[in-house]
């Protein structure tokens, strides 16, 4: 029992230190001039492709956490947790290409990519200690979650609008119609591994 809580502390501490010392240091770099005009940003959203490899010219594989590519960052104030989001861009879509990635953080399972129009599925283990998505059961409809994508450095607020349990084989929510909105889905297993807990969120208005 003591080891499990030490493991949670160590992994959370590693994640916090990484996000503060490496991720945020780059994302928070600013310039005197806007990186995008409103027209350019709208065009980039329509194309769902960051210009020039991202607004700072950084690519998705420019930063690694414990050997895995970093796609962005998730902040969940309700449960006081934040983690790097791991993922790889493959043929224009996002996924985690190494199943071992979810042993060190949360990762993209499927989707258009963080902060893009459409749905992105983010998965994480459910540990009793609360590590990774083990505290997702405490999240409620109306809670705010923040996503920062590494490609553009944009931090957006999302609001949870649905939370439910379904069979592990259910992937019907993966390709749902978001009506032109940015959305994401958080997925974690339940204690018996036959069901999953799904949390749906869309960009806050």
Predicted regions and their residues:
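Solvent-exposed, non-transmembrane regions of membrane-associated and secreted proteins
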Residues: 1-205
């Amino acid at each position: 029992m003591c080891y499990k809580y030490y493991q949670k502390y160590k992994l959370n501490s590693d994640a916090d230190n990484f996000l503060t010392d490496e991720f945020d240091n780059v994302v928070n770099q600013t310039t005197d001039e806007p990186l995008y005009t409103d027209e350019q940003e709208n065009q980039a959203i329509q194309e769902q492709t960051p210009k020039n490899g991202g607004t700072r010219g950084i690519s998705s594989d420019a930063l690694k956490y414990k050997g895995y590519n970093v796609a962005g960052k998730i902040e969940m104030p309700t449960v006081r947790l934040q983690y790097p989001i791991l993922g790889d861009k493959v043929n224009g879509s996002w996924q985690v290409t190494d199943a071992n990635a979810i042993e060190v953080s949360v990762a993209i399972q499927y989707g258009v990519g963080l902060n893009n129009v459409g749905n992105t599925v983010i998965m994480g283990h459910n540990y009793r200690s609360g590590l990774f998505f083990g505290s997702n059961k405490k999240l409620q409809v109306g809670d705010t979650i923040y996503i920062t994508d590494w490609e553009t450095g944009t931090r957006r607020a999302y609001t949870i609008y649905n939370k439910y349990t379904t069979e592990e084989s259910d992937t019907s929510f993966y390709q749902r119609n978001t009506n032109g909105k940015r959305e994401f889905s958080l997925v974690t297993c339940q204690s018996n591994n036959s069901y999953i807990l799904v949390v749906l969120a869309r960009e806050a208005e």
